[in-house]
UniProtKB/Swiss-Prot annotation:
Species of the source: Schizosaccharomyces pombe (strain 972 / ATCC 24843) (Fission yeast)
Name of the molecule in the record: Smr domain-containing protein C11H11.03c
Keywords linked to the UniProt accession: Cytoplasm, Nucleus
Cellular component terms (Gene Ontology): cytosol; nucleus
Localization per record: Cytoplasm; Nucleus
GO molecular function, one term: ATP-dependent polydeoxyribonucleotide 5'-hydroxyl-kinase activity
All copies of domain Smr, residue ranges: 75-150
Any Gene Ontology biological process: DNA repair
Higher taxonomy: Eukaryota, Fungi, Dikarya, Ascomycota, Taphrinomycotina
Domain of life: Eukaryota
PROSITE patterns: SMR
Amino acid sequence: MEEYEKFRALASKEAEKRGYLFQEAQHAYSAGNKAKAHELSQEGKLCGERMENYNRQAASAIYLYKNSQCNPDEIDLHGLYIDEAVQAVQQRIENCIRRGDNHLHIIVGRGNHSANHVEKLRPAIVRMLEQQSIKYNSEVNEGRIYVYLPSATSPIQPNFNCIQEPQEAYSRPQHSTLTDQVEPEKIVEEIATNCFPRLKTCCAIM
């Protein structure tokens, strides 16, 4: 968590500096000093690149921390910005389908940390699932989404009423899947290394 907070703080500083430099570049351009405006603009772009790099490192750190504690059929998106979370879920779904898994629990939270407690992450994930025609259902505690993966010919309806606490294990499908044989740490590392290096922008956090 300390590493995550450190990188987010560094990214925030670079974002502030970038905003200041772009503003000064506009002032210089308005004053007719195009050379100075270009110089300031280039410095601002460098700040933006550093900001993105810090955010990628923060996303990777929090993802590894949260998901190393999850079951193989879960993905925890706490701490990720919206676009980071969407990319992580897309990558995870692709990996699950390749392994022949038939479901995935997506932990999206309840929006308690969002401005005015308005959920932003769940709608973004749901929109992505609907765009890809992937079936899903909300779970009892409202902080999770159960996804029926396309690889499953007959997805098993989960008994949502039996879910008590987030840390309790979920019932497995009646047939075994490759996920049961894959170490959770390997799944987490696969997502973090393949997904987060592709991030380009960062949006509101959940």
